[in-house]
Amino acid sequence: MKDLVVVVPDSNTEQTLYGLLERHKALQIRRIEYRILVHPERDPGVLQRGASLLAEIDALNAFRYALLIFDREGCGKEMLTSSELEQQVQQQLDASGWQGRSAVVVIDPELESWVFATSPHVVDVFAGGDAEVFQRVVESFPKTPLGKPQKPMEAVKKLLRQKAIVRASALYKELASRVSLKGCIDPAFQRLCAILRSWFPQD
């Protein structure tokens, strides 16, 4: 039996998780065996049918824990808060036999909000090391209370366009493999780390 199965909405989230989960020491967890599934229906699919996807592969008997991750933006139920969405999906998981062995993390508004951590690696990966362009692009967007762009995906796309960098999933994995985890204060990211630490404490 493997430790963890994760259902995600797209390859960018998939590669971010690959980059993160290999850094077990930085996450303060033991090394784990895991599998990541990309739902073909993206965010709405994880929201509405993530538990069904786990049932299709008989994950209950193959993995100790299950984690569902998706963006609030684009999930189709943006009128609900992240907490309300997490509770809704958790009820589906509990009804499917995952009670006490599962969790849901909803990123608000979207994965790209994790990109804007306080780290020079962010500038290196998404702006080709050009701190001036990075700052100019970030300042061109309205900010959240945490000082991040309110539309992080648009900010990422604008950065990559200005530096002629192709937007690829490999960028997300590279950043997740390098960035200081302490620099990411996004609530969903902090929740993810806390869940992993509770399930897989260091030996």
For the regions a protein language model found, what residue spans apply to each?
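Conserved SAM-binding loop
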Residues: 6
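C-terminal accessory helical subdomains adjacent to catalytic cores in phosphodiester-
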Residues: 1-3, 14-40, 50-203
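Helix N-cap/beta->alpha junction signal
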Residues: 9-10
